[in-house]
């Protein structure tokens, strides 16, 4: 077996900790010791070896103990894992099932494990070319199998596709193991004292890495379905309190949401938290500060805030601050005023970061903006269907940023920079200001630039809006952006909640919004 599977085997079998899984139907937490989870993984491996020994296994479903076990089960059987999301609310079951199986086939996955309603939906369509197995059956055969050695990948991870078509990153067992070890080393994970709590989806790199890093450490982990969080976001705080969690992770919008409506919070204890990772989307310094201040009466230590940087191409984490420092904000002053950016820490062990400015690399702490390039032991082997990348080469991320005294600062995506009248404007700065307007939905704002041929040339802000007075909200938004960003939007487009296109991981697809606006002209 791979070193990744071997190390996880030793950690899970020796662990005294538990995997606690929330049953969304009953709202009860089910306890599963990590050795039990590994036993289920061995059963899954035996099932896979009895069914054509697939090179890759697809997983779809809620984050049950069986699904978590199936990840290690696939690795014990020498197979790669690819996890895809379930249907969103309002989706057509047949179209979702067809699209999911088509995506699996497109990346070479011909064996899929699922359970419950997801399994029934997948089996309701034409499954030619795909073996669909019942995960509940596969995990409970009470059998074990001799682990299979494999030189193949461990994970076929979909990328976000927020600025283009999504691709599939090929992650080797060594890359995954290096990233998990680097993350645990940076935050100092200790199975004897730490408890993790997560609602992040396992098909997303941050959600998968959080679960696997806990398994690698043998640390207790409380795992809730993402749908349980979206149905009632403030339950997250109750889960943190009930579990005595010391570690959690979420994208920026979740912290903003809690901080914005903190008056709803009562009778929780967040005093144990020492690591609250913030990643997956741009960090709002003001919103994160508001969260920390609002949670302070409930024992939250602002030093636990860890705004971080990562991407699927590097397995997950690239830079993470040292716990205890808290949010560091770097101020940049230009012609439009002062702007705050979160400092995202230094590279985790095994990774390197540099800033490319044309034909040369910017020096450390030079604060010169350029494209962020990375390399290291956590890097992907390449994109599926494309040439492998040289592990010694620097990988251009497409993100713009600079290196400050406290580490990496990310300014935005190179493809999304708005150039107007000789100025470069990062859309996230405009979006954070626009989101402060009453009625504008948190995390549902897109700022983009349109060309001279558009009927609305210049800066356009599109936002999901729910409120009684669009006219006043539009005027306030324009005034705020003009005052704080130094540019006047040429147009503000309000759309109904849920209208802006997103990726499967929930990131806004800015280029898709641009195309839809151009088509409407």
Swiss-Prot record:
Write down the chemical reaction(s) this protein catalyses: a long-chain fatty acid + holo-[ACP] + ATP = a long-chain fatty acyl-[ACP] + AMP + diphosphate; a medium-chain fatty acid + holo-[ACP] + ATP = a medium-chain fatty acyl-[ACP] + AMP + diphosphate; dodecanoate + holo-[ACP] + ATP = dodecanoyl-[ACP] + AMP + diphosphate; dodecanoate + ATP + H(+) = dodecanoyl-AMP + diphosphate
Per its UniProt record, what Pfam families does this chain match? AMP-binding (PF00501)
Keyword Nucleotide-binding attached: yes
CDD domains, from UniProt? FAAL (cd05931)
What EC designation does it have?
Answer: 6.2.1.20, 6.2.1.47
Physiological role: Activates lipidic moieties required for mycobactin biosynthesis. Converts medium- to long-chain aliphatic fatty acids into acyl adenylate, which is further transferred on to the phosphopantetheine arm of the carrier protein MbtL. May play a role in virulence by supporting bacterial growth in the liver.
Protein name as catalogued? Medium/long-chain-fatty-acid--[acyl-carrier-protein] ligase MbtM
């Amino acid at each position: 077996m791979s070193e990744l599977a071997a190390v996880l085997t030793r950690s899970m079998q020796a662990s005294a900790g538990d995997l606690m899984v929330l049953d969304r139907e009953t709202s009860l937490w089910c306890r599963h010791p990590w050795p039990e989870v590994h036993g289920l993984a061995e059963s899954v491996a035996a099932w896979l070896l009895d069914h054509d020994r697939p090179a890759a296994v697809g997983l779809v479903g809620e984050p049950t103990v069986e699904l978590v076990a199936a990840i290690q089960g696939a690795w014990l059987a020498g197979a790669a894992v690819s996890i895809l999301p379930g249907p969103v609310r309002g989706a057509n079951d047949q179209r979702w099932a067809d699209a999911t199986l088509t995506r699996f086939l497109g990346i070479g996955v011909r064996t899929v494990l699922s359970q419950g309603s997801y399994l029934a939906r997948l089996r309701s369509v034409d499954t030619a070319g795909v073996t669909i197995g019942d995960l509940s059956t596969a995990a409970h055969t009470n059998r074990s199998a001799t682990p299979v050695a494999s030189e193949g990948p461990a994970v076929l991870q979909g990328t976000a596709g927020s600025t283009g078509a999504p691709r599939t990153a090929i992650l080797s067992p060594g890359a995954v193991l290096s990233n998990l070890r680097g993350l645990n080393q940076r935050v100092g994970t200790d199975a004897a004292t730490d408890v993790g709590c997560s609602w992040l989806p396992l098909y997303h790199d941050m959600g998968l890495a959080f679960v696997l890093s806990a398994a690698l450490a043998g640390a207790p982990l409380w795992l809730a379905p993402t749908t349980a969080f979206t149905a009632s976001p403030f339950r997250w705080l109750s889960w943190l309190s009930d579990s005595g969690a010391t570690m959690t992770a979420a994208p920026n919008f979740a912290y903003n949401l809690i901080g914005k409506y903190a008056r709803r919070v009562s009778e929780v204890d967040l005093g144990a938290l020492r690591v609250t990772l913030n990643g997956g989307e741009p960090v709002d310094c003001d919103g994160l500060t508001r969260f920390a201040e609002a949670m302070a009466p409930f024992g939250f230590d602002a030093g636990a805030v860890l705004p971080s940087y990562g991407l699927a191409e590097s397995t997950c984490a690239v830079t993470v601050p040292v716990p205890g420092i808290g949010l560091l904000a770097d101020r940049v002053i230009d012609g439009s005023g002062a702007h705050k950016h979160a400092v995202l820490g230094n590279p985790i062990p095994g990774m390197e970061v540099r800033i490319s400015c044309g034909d040369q690399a910017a020096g450390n702490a030079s604060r010169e903006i350029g494209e962020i390039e990375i390399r290291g032991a956590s890097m992907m082997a390449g994109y599926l269907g494309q040439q492998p990348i040289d592990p010694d080469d620097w990988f251009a991320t497409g993100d713009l940023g600079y290196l400050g005294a406290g580490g990496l600062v990310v300014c935005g995506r190179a493809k999304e920079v708005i150039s107007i009248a000789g100025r470069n404007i990062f859309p996230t700065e405009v979006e954070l200001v626009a989101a402060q307007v009453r009625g504008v939905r948190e995390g549902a704002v897109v700022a983009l630039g349109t060309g001279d041929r558009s009927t609305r040339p210049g800066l356009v802000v599109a936002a999901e809006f729910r409120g009684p007075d669009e006219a006043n909200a539009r005027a306030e938004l324009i005034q705020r952006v003009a005052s704080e960003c130094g540019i006047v939007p040429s147009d503000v487009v309000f759309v109904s909640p849920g209208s802006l296109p997103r990726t499967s991981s929930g990131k806004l697809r800015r280029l898709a919004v641009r195309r839809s606006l151009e088509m409407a002209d």
